[in-house]
Swiss-Prot record:
Any one GO MF annotation of this record: translation elongation factor activity
InterPro entries cross-referenced by the UniProt entry: EF-Ts_dimer_sf (IPR036402), Transl_elong_EFTs/EF1B (IPR001816), Transl_elong_EFTs/EF1B_dimer (IPR014039), Transl_elong_Ts_CS (IPR018101), UBA-like_sf (IPR009060)
SUPFAM superfamilies, A to Z: Elongation factor Ts (EF-Ts), dimerisation domain (SSF54713), UBA-like (SSF46934)
Protein name according to UniProt: Elongation factor Ts
Phylogenetic lineage: Bacteria, Pseudomonadati, Pseudomonadota, Alphaproteobacteria, Hyphomicrobiales
A GO CC term assigned to this protein in UniProt: cytoplasm
Species: Rhodopseudomonas palustris (strain HaA2)
One of the Pfam families matching this protein, by short name: EF_TS
Function per UniProt: Associates with the EF-Tu.GDP complex and induces the exchange of GDP to GTP. It remains bound to the aminoacyl-tRNA.EF-Tu.GTP complex up to the GTP hydrolysis stage on the ribosome.
Region entry Involved in Mg(2+) ion dislocation from EF-Tu, spans: 80-83
Length: 308
């Protein structure tokens, strides 16, 4: 049986990021063979990763990446915010965004895409095994234009292109690319701050608009307004609602006078040198729609100490 030295354990630990005792056991189980020990730990780590897959992953990072006329935004979740500050996890998010930029926004295709000798899904599993938390590629979206730019903005960035919120905005134009890109970034910042639900009223969910209309009408009926006036009052109310939730009608955050985004874009055409059309936007906020697990402090202490 081969002698397991401290140097061998140190090398294996640095290679895999696994704890010292596990590394020592891996080398002992594989007669000091470093490559076999790595495989042994991978198998053990993957087994641990499978057990962690049932945990809620509601933290993590949003990644946004653009390349001229196309861009992607992704959400990769972890269990704790601590992992989001881990360099390996941050690198994983950037890598997945780069893959998504090539293969598109289909999560299954991204997971199956080759990365080195493995796949994106394999890289995620390796990270789970090394870092010790459940992780998942939750969602992805992409925008592309034939002419123009797709710009991005990341809010709360921990590294370039990854943070707590990510936005991509697609602008179609034959104008100056640099000017267009600057406008696109400003619009992406606006989307992050104002959280529009659609580009214009036509893009809103008809059921949502219908519900707004009904709520307004009932409100004015209860106030005793005449039926022949309610329709007009509701229409005016909907115009106000559209200014709150439709990007082109929102007050532009970069304009002190509060002109509408649509008007600001129209005025920017002179600087860009060509007509500009906003094709679409995507805004991802970390963990939105995920129900986080909570526990009281006493339960957490009991869990750590092994009590029931």
């Amino acid at each position: 049986m081969a002698t397991i030295t401290a140097a061998m354990v140190k090398e294996l630990r640095e290679t895999t990021g696994v704890g010292m005792m596990d590394c020592k056991q891996a080398l002992a189980e594989n007669d000091g063979n470093m490559e076999a020990a790595v495989d042994w730990l991978r198998k053990k780590g993957l087994s641990k990763a499978a057990k962690k897959a049932g945990r809620v992953a509601a933290e993590g990072l949003i990644g946004a990446l653009t390349d001229g006329t196309k861009g992607v935004v992704i959400e990769v979740n972890s269990e704790t915010d601590f992992v989001a500050r881990n360099e390996q996890f941050q690198g994983l998010v950037k890598m997945i965004a780069q893959v998504a930029l090539k293969v598109g926004a289909d999560v299954d295709k991204i997971n199956a895409a080759p990365v080195g000798s493995s796949t994106v899904a394999g890289a995620i599993s390796d990270a789970i095994a090394t870092i010790g938390e459940n992780m998942t590629l939750r969602r992805a979206a992409a925008l592309e234009v034939s002419q123009g730019v797709v710009a991005s903005y990341v809010h709360g960035a921990v590294i370039e292109g990854a943070g707590k919120m990510g936005v991509i905005v697609a602008l179609e134009s034959t104008g100056k690319t640099d000017e267009l890109a600057a406008l696109g970034r400003q619009l992406a910042m606006h989307v992050a701050a104002a959280n529009p639900q659609a580009l214009d009223p036509a893009g809103l969910d008809p059921d949502v608009v219908r519900r707004e209309r009904e709520v307004m009408a009932d409100k004015y009926r209860q106030q005793g307004k005449p039926e022949n006036m309610i329709e007009k009052i509701v229409e005016n109310g909907l115009k106000t609602y559209y200014k709150e939730v439709c990007l082109l009608e929102q007050a532009y955050i970069h304009d002190e006078k509060g002109k509408a985004v649509g008007q600001a874009v129209k005025e920017a055409e002179g600087k860009v040198g060509a007509p500009i059309k906003i094709i679409g936007f995507v805004r991802y906020a970390l963990g939105e729609g995920i129900e986080k697990q909570t526990s009281d402090f006493a339960a957490e202490v009991a869990a750590v100490s092994g009590q029931k």
